[in-house]
Amino acid sequence: MIAYFTKTSIGYSHIKENKVCQDYSACYHDEDRTIITACDGHGGEIYVRSHLGSKFASNAVIKVLRELERSDFYKYSRKDICNNLRLKILCEWNAMVERDLLKKYITKKEVTHLNEDRLFQDFA
């Protein structure tokens, strides 16, 4: 029997500054596979929903890997499999982010601490 668990904990600086934990971990197990993820949030001030992004990343990895067929490992090269997985995970993550934004738009409250100079500095 395989036993597994995940534990995500908030760092001291986030507690001290009253910030939400931006990291996320999850696991999935069935008779064919065990998938364990650990996703780190973006960590910058401008990433106001980083805690959701890491959750979406974790869920995207699990969803894509659950859909992966064992036979694919015999049909394609390791490089092709990795490139395909990266693309599928990214597409799934983007879809999750877009669905979330459609359900809950970014509010002024979430971005009041940001100004244009700060945004352009971080993206430059």
Please provide the spans of the model-predicted regions:
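PP2C/PPM-type serine/threonine phosphatase catalytic domain
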Residues: 1-124
